Amino acid sequence: MADVKSAQDKAMEIAQMLEDSKAENVSVIDVSELNSWTDYFVIATIHSSAHWQGLAKQVKDYVKENDMEIHVTHNKAASGDDWNLIDIGSVVVHLMSADAREFYDLEKLWHGGKKLR
């Protein structure tokens, strides 16, 4: 029988993968008690558009390898470089520039969630 990974396991694996690929300040927040549309946020600081594209490809490859589905991918800025969101259902990945991360401060906004990393 195949080993079924929990949403938390997947969030932590994605976070580690991002950190291994030079994303900075990678955090995982359990927001399952705060909303009805996702369980975990993975938040990471990116350095450039090229860095974002590489990380997004890795996340998409992870999703495919783990029989998951991407629900939505959004660019949250006109340039598309400041905040990129990949929604895979129970996990939402936020890839943000340092400026966007400081400005939006998702960790503070979702302070009621349990920080796992």
Model-found features: residue ranges?
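Short, hydrophobic/aromatic-rich beta-strand segments within well-structured domains
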Residues: 41-44, 84-86, 92-96
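N-terminal presequence-like segments and adjacent domain-start helices
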Residues: 1-7
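Short amphipathic alpha-helices in soluble, non-transmembrane regions
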Residues: 55-60
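A short interface-forming secondary-structure element
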Residues: 43-52
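C-terminal binding/interaction regions
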Residues: 92-117
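N-terminal first-folded block
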Residues: 8-40
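Glycine/charge-rich, flexible interdomain linkers and switch-proximal surface loops
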Residues: 25, 29-35, 71-90
